[in-house]
């Protein structure tokens, strides 16, 4: 799976029930060979992917392409990646804690 393919799957694994009443934008800045920016916007529980990102996300995750794919494939725990500096988080940390429930098959 490529980085782009992993993001294209996000709307399919998004859990609208976990986002009920939520209006937030999450953004991922991916570095490395498959570098790119993707945002996922949630408005009143409905989500959509925004390739290229947005100007002012509520939270930004920065991670290498290889580590991102390892996280999405379940080979690297996101919390462990954060604690070891492989995954950087800026913005709403409470929102970061909700990501596993928003995207249950994304790790």
Predicted regions: what they are:
Residues 1-107:
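Feature captures hydrophobic
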């Amino acid at each position: 799976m490529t980085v782009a393919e992993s993001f294209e799957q996000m709307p399919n694994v998004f859990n609208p029930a976990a986002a009920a009443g939520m209006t937030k934008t999450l953004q991922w800045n991916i570095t490395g060979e498959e570098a790119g920016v993707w945002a996922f916007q949630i408005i009143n529980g409905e989500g959509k992917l925004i390739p290229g990102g947005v100007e002012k996300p509520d939270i930004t995750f920065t991670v290498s392409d290889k580590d991102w794919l390892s996280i999405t494939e379940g080979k690297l725990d996101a919390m462990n990646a954060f604690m070891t500096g492989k995954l950087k988080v800026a913005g709403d940390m409470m929102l970061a804690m909700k990501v596993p429930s928003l995207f249950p098959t994304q790790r």
